[in-house]
UniProtKB/Swiss-Prot annotation:
One of its GO terms (biological process) is response to glucose. Residues 238-250 have a biased composition (Pro residues). The chain crosses the membrane at residues 25-45, 77-97, 137-157, 189-209. InterPro entries: Connexin (IPR000500), Connexin_CCC (IPR019570), Connexin_CS (IPR017990), Connexin_N (IPR013092), Connexin_N_sf (IPR038359). Residues 233-294 are annotated as: Disordered. Keywords: Cell junction, Cell membrane, Gap junction, Membrane, Transmembrane, Transmembrane helix. Belongs to the connexin family. Delta-type subfamily. Disulfide bonds: none annotated. Residues 1-24, 98-136, 210-294 are cytoplasmic. The gene is GJD3. Residues 46-76, 158-188 are extracellular. This is Gap junction delta-3 protein. Expressed in vascular smooth muscle cells. Found in heart, colon, and artery (at protein level). Found in cerebral cortex, heart, liver, lung, kidney, spleen and testis.
Amino acid sequence: MGEWAFLGSLLDAVQLQSPLVGRLWLVVMLIFRILVLATVGGAVFEDEQEEFVCNTLQPGCRQTCYDRAFPVSHYRFWLFHILLLSAPPVLFVVYSMHRAGKEAGGAEAAAQCAPGLPEAQCAPCALRARRARRCYLLSVALRLLAELTFLGGQALLYGFRVAPHFACAGPPCPHTVDCFVSRPTEKTVFVLFYFAVGLLSALLSVAELGHLLWKGRPRAGERDNRCNRAHEEAQKLLPPPPPPPPPPALPSRRPGPEPCAPPAYAHPAPASLRECGSGRGKASPATGRRDLAI
């Protein structure tokens, strides 16, 4: 029972990532398969070879007839079935633990690389969620494939009824030998019960796969919307950008001196000489006549 408890603890870790349908599948797996097979199946099928009796004393005939009647023991076939069904969920648990360890180791570095940037935090988170969802979808698909394969194998190998009588012919038996199976009715009931549990498990796997595919795209859209809203809120909380610097002022043109005005460094001229232009022209003839008179 220690092996069954260890397997149950591994499968129990899957429910952290599973929806409600996946948890129902886990209940069916733990109770109606592992528990029933560990407690009842071993007691029903443990003596099938010892109690397989043939009406001959020919050495090797009984073993050969038993091998032809049951190519693989029911009990071992179902054990192998449970192991293969448990492999995808256990691998997903190992992957989740590995990813959790890597994220815990690089959380501080990621926080230092992108402090206060929501888009840098939302994008890796969404990427990890998509990877985990794809891995879980793959595990459910592999589980469903294993379930259908073993249901078909059980129907082909054993059918749905354990016959109490088996007629065996061929070497090393000298003639047609009649062989008899112990407790055929009890074994038939158990075979039908296990096949029904397999059908229920397959239906739950199909429902879970459809649920994940149907709910995956809206959840991805909601996640993107949340990241966009967080980015917009962060942009609102940021301080306003500084105003742009004013353009450089153009150099102003200094007004030049008047055409008739003397420069600033010149001495002031006499009042009689301050007239210019036309006034100077009018005063010239009078001055000339005054000179001539002298």
